[in-house]
Every structure is written in C-alpha cells, then in structure tokens.
Amino acid sequence: MIVLSKEDHAALHAPPKQLPIEAVMDGPIEVWDDETPLPDDEVLVPFLKEVELAAGSGRTSIEINTKRRLRFGKYTLRNQGVEPCNARCVVIYGNSMEPVLRNGATVGVDVGNTRIIDGDLYAITHGGQLRVKQAYRLPGGGIRLRSFNRDEHPDEEYTPDEVVAQEIEIIGRVFWGAMFF
C-alpha cells in the first residue's frame, strides 16, 4: 500500500496547470483576407487543380487555380530550397497516403525539382489525374509509385514505354504538408 501526504494527494488530483498564453504565442495573431496587402517577405502560392476537358470524355488536365492561394514566407521557401516562383499547393484526395497525409491534406510542391530521389514524395500527373506518391526510379528508366496505405493501394510499376503511354509526369517534389485532424 502506498501512503500519500495530503499535499501529494492534492497535487496528484489537481487539474493540470494552464500555461500563460505568452508561453505558447510569440506576438499577436494577425488576421488577413484577400484585401490585406502582402508583406514584402511573403508570397501567395497558387493551388493546382484538375479540370475536366470538354465533351465529357472523363479526361482531365492540371491547371493553376487562380482563386485559391496560400501565404508562405519567402525565407521559409528558400530554407527548403524552393524558389518562390516554383511553389505550388496541392490538396490530397482519397486515403492512399494515409496515415501520413489524410484526405483533404494540403502539400507544398516545388515544380522546379522534378529529379526523383528514391522514396521522396512527388506531385504527379497520370493521364491528367493529379496524384501525390512516393516515387522510385527503376532500372532502364521505369518508375515505381508507392502509397503509404499499401494495404489498399499496392505499388505501381511502369516501364519507360508505359510512362509515356499513360502520360505519367513528375510535377514536382513535395516540400511541405499540413492537415486537420
């Protein structure tokens, strides 16, 4: 049997102490909207989106969404090796990248970096479909695309001829991600 003093018992059952707001915030929260001027040290990064082509063919193309943008600090981008003019954002749809990137997560993509480093994440266009996958180079110029949710989404391997025929292209390397829980 363990015997506690009244002070230890009270401390054990006391509600957790709240940190003062100053302990977790460094300065005020700035609220901004589309009318707020952009500071010199920030850029607005556009989102990419799939657009269905005419005549209901089911085919899509990837375009810049001119209405949706996300603010990034220029220093933050350059610290990741990304030139601000090469930054884009992409929304993840589906469960193929769970548990790392959930449905609805947003990732930052460097369109100036398309050289595959095995295992890194890339935004890819696959026959006009926008996808985010781990990519691996295969001997002879092929490519392996991997999902984190491999139980439901097994690896996909493509020969160089299949890469061309299925219109698989690397859009850019993922450098940042965020999601809500």
Task: Provide a role label for each language-model segment.
Residues 1-103, 164, 177-181:
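Short, positionally conserved secondary-structure boundary motifs
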Residues 78-181:
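Acidic/glycine-rich C-terminal interaction modules and beta/coil loop segments
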